[in-house]
Each structure stands twice: as structure tokens, then as C-alpha cells.
Amino acid sequence: MTTVLPAFWAVIPAAGIGARMAADRPKQYLQLGGQTILEHSLDCFLDHSALKGVVVSIAEDDPYWPGLRCASDLRIQRAPGGRERADSVLNALLLLHAQGASDDDWVLVHDAARPNLARSDLDKLLSELADDPVGGLLAVPARDTLKRAGADGRVAATVDRSTVWQAYTPQMFRLGMLHRALAECLVSDVAVTDESSAIEWAGHAPRLVEGRSDNIKVTRPEDLEWLRQRWSGRR
């Protein structure tokens, strides 16, 4: 039996500068396999038949976005980037609301610098969360031994990794629920590191959907080098 996947909007917060990459431009605009990291991050969504549209949150003075081929794609809309990730995502949700999107619509938020999302992971997320009352996120169980550090930089404790997961993206929630959670967090000055943390703060428990560990976020130069080696000859 063929599973019908739910329609969804994709939101890509792409206003960050990626200081840890120490590059001459924001990391999402670095080259990987013939196009930018951001374009790769968009591709998996643009190729999906259940996509309703994409909103990319871009800094107002961003000189790189207009030069991308995808910037003229009619399925992609641009929202203003904010000071923090949560501001950028909220601006994208406000744009969707203003254009008539429903509170019940699914929204998938994905990192601009996470270019190796597998179609199978995207379909798995959509399938497993289609009827979920809260939503959830792609994640990977922790594999390495984890240490908690003290203020002196020494090991304070070893963390039980059996219940620890690494949060990945996309993170999938209803538009209305995510909008309210992010807005309340910002008003209350709550630190929001990802969309799931806002939903958690609002009193909900997002579901963890196990994904591939190679769906990495490019944060440091060695991340990009790893992807370049992996993709060598792929395109």
C-alpha cells in the first residue's frame, strides 16, 4: 500500500554568518559539488511532490542570494532574517500566515548549512509524524561517550548516553503551534536553540525520529572537507 505523505511548507533560516568557518562569506554560500551549500539544502525539498512552498529567511543586506539560480524559483519566497534563528523562523511563519497558510499546515524547518539530507529521511519524518499531535524532529542517538565539563575545563561527570540524542533537522511542527511557541519564548526572553526547544518550553514533547548520521550541519572547516571528500565524483 502506498503511503500518502502530508503536504508541507519548508522554512530555511539563512541569515547566519557562520563565524566558526572563518570563511570570506557566510557558510551557506560556500561551494560544495558545483553549487552552494544552501542550494543543496533546498534541493531535497524542491524535488518533493508534497511541497507547498519554501520560505528562506535572508539578511537584508545579503549580496549572495540574488545571484543564485534558485532565487528566481517561484516556489521560494524570501522573508527578512532576524537577529537570532528564532526571529528568522518567526518572520517566515508570519509571511506564511499573511499569505493564507493555515495554523494546521505542517512546517518543516531545516538548517541552511545541512546539505546532505537524504530523501528517505525526509519521507520517514513526514510519514511517522503525519498524524502526530505535536510533531517532532530528525535525530540520532548519541554514539560517543559524553562528558560534562566543570568551570575549570575538567571532567565533572560522565553522561549516560543511553537516553541522549543529537537533534538534527528538519524539525516538523504545525504552523500555529510553532508560531505561538516561538513568539512566547521571545517575549519571555527564553533562549531558543532550535524549534523543538520552543515547543518543549510550551509544554509539549516532540517525537524523535531516527535519521541518518551523515545528515551533518556544516559548522567547521573539517565538516565541509568531509562532505567534499564524500561527494567527490558524485556530481
Curated annotation (Swiss-Prot):
Reactions it catalyzes: 2-C-methyl-D-erythritol 4-phosphate + CTP + H(+) = 4-CDP-2-C-methyl-D-erythritol + diphosphate
Principal EC category: transferase
EC number assigned by the record: 2.7.7.60
Pathway: Isoprenoid biosynthesis; isopentenyl diphosphate biosynthesis via DXP pathway; isopentenyl diphosphate from 1-deoxy-D-xylulose 5-phosphate: step 2/6
Domain of life according to the entry: Bacteria
GO biological process: isopentenyl diphosphate biosynthetic process, methylerythritol 4-phosphate pathway
Site (Transition state stabilizer): 20, 27
Gene Ontology molecular function, alphabetical: 2-C-methyl-D-erythritol 4-phosphate cytidylyltransferase activity
InterPro entries: IspD, IspD/TarI, IspD/TarI_cytidylyltransf_bact, ISPD_synthase_CS, Nucleotide-diphossugar_trans
Entry-linked PROSITE patterns: ISPD (PS01295)
Family according to the record: Belongs to the IspD/TarI cytidylyltransferase family. IspD subfamily.
Record-given protein name: 2-C-methyl-D-erythritol 4-phosphate cytidylyltransferase
Species annotation: Pseudomonas entomophila (strain L48)
Upper lineage: Bacteria, Pseudomonadati, Pseudomonadota, Gammaproteobacteria, Pseudomonadales
